[in-house]
Amino acid sequence: MITSFDDWPVHQSHLPIAHTATGDPNHYDRYFFNGYDSEGDIFFALAMGLYPNRHVMDASFSVIIGDEQVNVHASARANHDRMRCTEVGPVSVEIVEPLRRHRIRVDSPEHGLRADITMNATSVPFEEPVFQQRSGLRETMHYTRLTQLGRWTGWIEIDGVRKEINPASVTGSRDRSWGVR
C-alpha cells in the first residue's frame, strides 16, 4: 500500500517504505515529471534519481519552448541523510504536500535557465503492479512505481525571457519508482 511517506526518496527495497534494505548496487529511488501545454508551445521534463548503494544522485531538466531546447544535467555524491536527497546541483524537487503538490526549481545561469514550477495533482496516485524480472536465477529488476496526473503553474525562463505556466492549459504526469533496475 502506498502512503504519503512513499513520496520521499527513503526506500530501502522495491516495496513501500516499511520493508527491509537491499545491498544491490542497482537499488534506486527516482522521480520523473513532465508538462506540456495544449497549444504545443512548451514541453518540459525532470528526472531525478538517487542510487544509495553507489552513493550517487543525478538530475536532469529539459525544456522546449518554440524551437529552442535547453537541457541541464547534474550529478553529485549522495547525501547519507535521505531527507536531503531532493537537490542535485541547480535542480531541486520540493514535496510541498505529499502525493498532492510538488515544486521544481532550476537555477542554472550558465545554461541561461531558471524555473519555479509547481505540479498540483488532479488524480490520486495509481500504484502499478510490482514489476519483477529475472535472467536465469538472477533478479535483474524488481520495483514499484506510482503514477499521477496534474496541472502546472509557475514560470520558466530561458536567457532572461520568462514564460508563465498557466494551469488552465499546462498539464502533465509524474511517476515515482523505487527498487532494483
Q: Which ranges hold each PLM region?
A:
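Targeting-peptide/extracellular-domain and disordered-appendage signature
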Residues: 1-181
